[in-house]
Amino acid sequence: MTELETHLLNALEQLQQDYMQRLSEWESAFVELQKMFSLTQRDNAMLNERVMQLSQQVQHLSEQTERLSQLYSENWR
């Protein structure tokens, strides 16, 4: 094997090692992103449920306020 072939082989092996390292890093990052997505999805579902509950409370309070306003108006005629 010539010196040039040896250098090329070493360079190719180094490229392969670098590629495998980067691939491993990307795979790890992808797994972490999947976990983050799952947690965010769960949190969003919980927040959505809470928003719906609060919206119902606001609607209920609005209805109560309207009834009280009507009673007040009727009593002060």
UniProtKB/Swiss-Prot annotation:
Pfam families listed in its UniProt record: MbeD_MobD
Methyltransferase recorded as keyword: no
Key words, A-Z: Conjugation, Mobility protein, Plasmid
Transmembrane region(s): none
NCBIfam families: plas_excl_MbeD
Protein family membership: To E.coli MbaD and MbkD.
Task performed by this protein: This protein is essential to promote the specific transfer of the plasmid in the presence of conjugative plasmids.
Protein name per its UniProtKB record: Mobilization protein MbeD
Organism field: Escherichia coli
